């Protein structure tokens, strides 16, 4: 049902509000599958409404932040050694969706974790599962210094994943 709400609205078989109501009702669900589908559908909605007035786009992002922000705060950026793959995927999905929506807490935490990397190349606060999100959001919400720090990751990557993540981050800016 999570995957069908928005396609039904796109096809004219239901209203977008029905899909939004479903997403709101499912917020806080701890299933990675449900949250992945919700993030994908709400991300698509935000993307296709780019031509709408700024107030509408801001409203969609506030809604997305309301759906994913509380769970991002609950799960935190801290990965445990015994976290299941389901929990790791859930954390990555929720934090990425909250950041994409402009959730203040999530973006502040990204800035805090990016700062040591920017200042002296220290990746210790950035879990590999969140590297792409942290770099992308640092570039998106940062300035030239953040962009240059991510370009530094690209030029001297610790791993291939670092180089790929930095390319995605610079390309998404």
Task: Name the predicted role of every residue range.
Residues 1-173:
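Long, ordered, helix-rich scaffold segments
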């Amino acid at each position: 049902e999570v995957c069908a709400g928005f396609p039904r609205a796109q096809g004219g078989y239901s209203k977008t509000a029905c899909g939004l109501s479903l997403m709101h009702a499912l917020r806080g669900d701890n299933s990675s599958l449900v949250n992945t589908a919700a993030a994908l559908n709400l991300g698509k909605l935000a993307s296709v409404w780019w031509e709408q007035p700024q107030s509408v786009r801001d409203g969609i992002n506030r809604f997305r932040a309301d759906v994913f922000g509380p769970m991002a705060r609950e799960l935190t950026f801290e990965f445990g050694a015994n976290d299941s793959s389901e929990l790791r995927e859930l954390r990555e999905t929720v934090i990425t969706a909250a950041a994409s929506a402009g959730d203040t807490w999530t973006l502040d935490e990204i800035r805090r974790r990016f700062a040591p990397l920017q200042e002296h190349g220290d990746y210790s606060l950035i879990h590999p599962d969140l590297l792409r999100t942290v770099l992308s959001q640092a570039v998106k919400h940062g300035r030239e210094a953040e962009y240059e720090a991510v370009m530094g990751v690209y030029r001297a990557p610790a791993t291939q994943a670092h180089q790929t993540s930095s390319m995605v981050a610079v390309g998404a800016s």
